[in-house]
Curated annotation (Swiss-Prot):
Residues 333-350 have a biased composition (Polar residues). It comes from Homo sapiens (Human). Residues 265-368, 387-406 are annotated as: Disordered. This is Adrenocortical dysplasia protein homolog. The gene is ACD. Component of the shelterin complex (telosome) composed of TERF1, TERF2, TINF2, TERF2IP ACD and POT1. Forms heterodimers with POT1. Identified in a complex with POT1 and single-stranded telomeric DNA. Interacts with STN1 and TINF2.
Length: 458
């Protein structure tokens, strides 16, 4: 206050809000605007927490900053000025002496922003009037905004601790309503939550997944290769007769070259060894006992020979391997006949393979032989009966019916009952088309084969 008696305004609102000054002495301010008069305070809206105790809302300035002041009804009743009955309307520009006031924080609610305001409990309206100057609000100051964020965070933390029913959705609603002070609310929300980063779940093992799928019954996984007979095993089983399936020697491991082989049964008439000019090897059957020879030839050998081979006068050689070790050819070689089972051992000859010197090449002229070609994959009931001579029938004994194996090679039991196949597998099987060569062979086989009659050598 100057010595001439004029009341001079000095800044005090910002310092009071920041806490650097205490409201111990009266503060002088200028009434810039009447936001809500005392007459409309009862029915009109108000930004104060309790509208029943608010008498008027004024905008007061200290010459540097402005602040919103809520004058209580008690303050209106105790104060006195000449135009009190008309309210604060028409008193803009006059000076106010705030004798008792306090700083409060308005939380954002109902579209109103969060801000600091002063609650005036006792004041005096001076007759001095000065020209009004527009000044910025104190809540726009950076230091005041920082202090406001701290106060909001403290207020929300206290309300959260005191009221356990405050949910996260309510906090988000408050953040949505108060876009201006969203940063402080975000910091408060992060402090209320436990942010530990992404949670990496432990990897689920195969056995854990199988255990979760099991519903009271044991679940086992068996490879399909153990439940199905491979093509090589099926080829070997189909190439053997009923007797050899139960009493024959143990077969070697399957060879991939067997996939293109066919079974050819050749019945040749008896002939003397001297007619060919080539001595017989040891282990071969004599002319009286040789009635049937079995040879596994490549499927390509059944086709027509090359033109260069057609000019040759020699017929197709009959390949038969002896179980014993063969010795070099000599005129003193033993000619002891062996049993039919020892001499007629199936031999595997891959395609385009030249017979070795240890194999017997029968070059003697023979009569046309009757051949039955059997392809792998046909059921046993569609196969033509094998030709048998009298000597072979007398030598062989009746064999028992072949029974399917009970266990796999690894000792696991066979499973002959399966669930119905899936729809996709049925569709794939129905979409398979047979090759024309197989269809032609099947038609020829059905039209020419006579199961009731037994072929005779020509």
């Amino acid at each position: 206050m100057a010595g001439s008696g004029r009341l001079v305004l000095r800044p005090w609102i910002r310092e009071l809000i920041l806490g650097s000054e205490t409201p111990s002495s009266p503060r002088a301010g200028q009434l810039l605007e009447v936001l809500q008069d005392a007459e409309a305070a009862v029915a009109g809206p108000s930004h104060a927490p309790d509208t029943s105790d608010v008498g008027a809302t004024l905008l007061v300035s200290d010459g540097t900053h402005s602040v919103r002041c809520l004058v209580t009804r008690e303050a209106l009743d105790t104060s006195d000025w000449e135009e009190k009955e008309f309210g604060f309307r028409g008193t803009e520009g006059r000076l106010l002496l705030l004798q008792d006031c306090g700083v409060h924080v308005q939380v954002a609610e109902g579209g109103a922003p969060a801000e600091f305001y002063l609650q005036v409990d006792r004041f005096s309206l001076l007759p001095t009037e000065q020209p009004r100057l527009r000044v910025p609000g104190c809540n726009q100051d950076l230091d005041v905004q920082k202090k406001l964020y701290d106060c909001l965070e403290e207020h929300l933390s206290e309300s959260t601790s005191s009221n356990a029913g405050l949910s996260l959705s309510q906090l988000l609603d408050e953040m949505r309503e108060d876009q201006e002070h969203q940063g402080a609310l975000v910091c408060l929300a992060e402090s209320c939550l436990t942010l530990e980063g992404p949670c990496t779940a432990p990897p689920v093992t195969h056995w854990a997944a199988s255990r979760c799928k099991a519903t009271g019954e044991a679940v086992y996984t068996v490879p399909s290769s153990m439940l199905c007979i491979s093509e090589n095993d099926q080829l070997i089983l189909s190439s053997l007769g009923p007797c050899q399936r139960t009493q024959g020697p143990e077969l070697p491991p399957p060879d991939p070259a067997l996939q293109d082989l066919s079974l050819t049964l050749i019945a040749s008439p008896p002939s003397s060894p001297s007619s060919s000019g080539t001595p017989a090897l040891p282990g071969h059957m004599s002319s009286e006992e040789s009635g049937t020879s079995i040879s596994l030839l490549p499927a390509l050998s059944l086709a027509a020979p090359d033109p260069g081979q057609r000019s040759s006068s020699q017929p197709s050689p009959a390949i038969c391997s002896a179980p014993a070790t063969l010795t070099p050819r000599s005129p003193h070689a033993s000619r002891t006949p062996s049993s039919p089972l020892q001499s007629c051992t199936p031999s595997l000859s891959p395609r385009s393979h030249v017979p070795s010197p240890h194999q017997a090449l029968v070059t003697r002229p023979q009569k046309p032989s009757l051949e039955f070609k059997e392809f792998v994959g046909l059921p046993c009931k569609n196969r033509p009966p094998f030709p048998r001579t009298g000597a072979t029938r007398g030598a062989q004994e009746p064999c028992s019916v072949w029974e399917p194996p009970k266990r796999h090679r690894d000792g696991s039991a066979f499973q002959y009952e399966y669930e119905p196949p899936c729809t996709s597998l049925c569709a794939r099987v129905q979409a398979v088309r047979l090759p024309p060569q197989l269809m032609a062979w099947a038609l020829h086989f059905l039209m020419d084969a006579q199961p009731g009659s037994e072929p005779t050598p020509m």
